[in-house]
Structures are given as C-alpha cells and as structure tokens.
Amino acid sequence: MDRAPDSIGPTVDVALLADAVQAVRGKLFVLGGGWDTLWVRAFPARHPSMAIGLRLRVPSSWGADMLKLSVELQDADGAPLLSQPLSHQVRLPGQSQPAATDFGVIRSFTFNNLLFARQGSYSFVISVDDEPVSRLRFTVRARPGEPPSPT
C-alpha cells in the first residue's frame, strides 16, 4: 500500500451496540441502540441477537483502495469468544476525493446466539487491516432479584 509516511489512519467516528442495525446507502438504521449493559436471567446466558453500528472515517491520504474491517468479541481477560472475527472487505473510493478530505465507511455487524458463560465485562475490538482502532465495552449482568446461577 502506498500510504504517506505521516498519514493518519482510519478512525472510528461512531460505534454503538444495539438490538439491531442496518447500514443502507451511507446511513445507520438503529433499533434499541446505545446500551452498555446486557441484563440476563441466569448464566450461562445465550443472547439471541445484538448488533454494532459503525462509522469509520478514512482520510483521503490513506492511499489504499481496500481495507479489512473486523470485529472480535473478547472477555475481560482479552480471550476471543468467537471462532474468528467478523470481517468485511471494504472498497474505498478512487481518486475522486479532493486532497485533505475524509470519507465515511458505514457498516453493521450482527451477532446471533452469543453465549456468555459468566457475568462480567466484555468488549468488541474493532480493527482495520488487523490493527485495533477502537474497543466497544459492555457488561453482562444478572437481573436483580434473579437467583444466582450454580457454579
């Protein structure tokens, strides 16, 4: 890739957790978004569906025509919880962008039937070309008044 030596890479403008997200024509359509705590009855807990809405800002000086955007779920110790990260190959606009401008990349990631073994902190690590650029943290907790899970 022909990147300028002083170029700043892509940055995350928006990253949020939601019940559902669609990315259509440069817009995020979000249902039940912006939460940071997932309440469950007991552990282990299987959550039917959650999503991430993401807007990445890419400077025109980035110099690449493609980038790999990935999201990996990790527990509090940094151990991955998915067999592999979810990834999108993103084609970037050609030379039609004026110099010194940025452009946005809008994407959504949906995760179905995630299993959370225990209460605690989790995070989605967002990476560009296998380099982490952001971390979206959340907690999974038992609802108050629910009996504790056997350990």
Regions from the language model: what does each represent?
Residues 2-119, 123-128, 132-151:
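Contiguous segments within soluble domain cores/interaction surfaces
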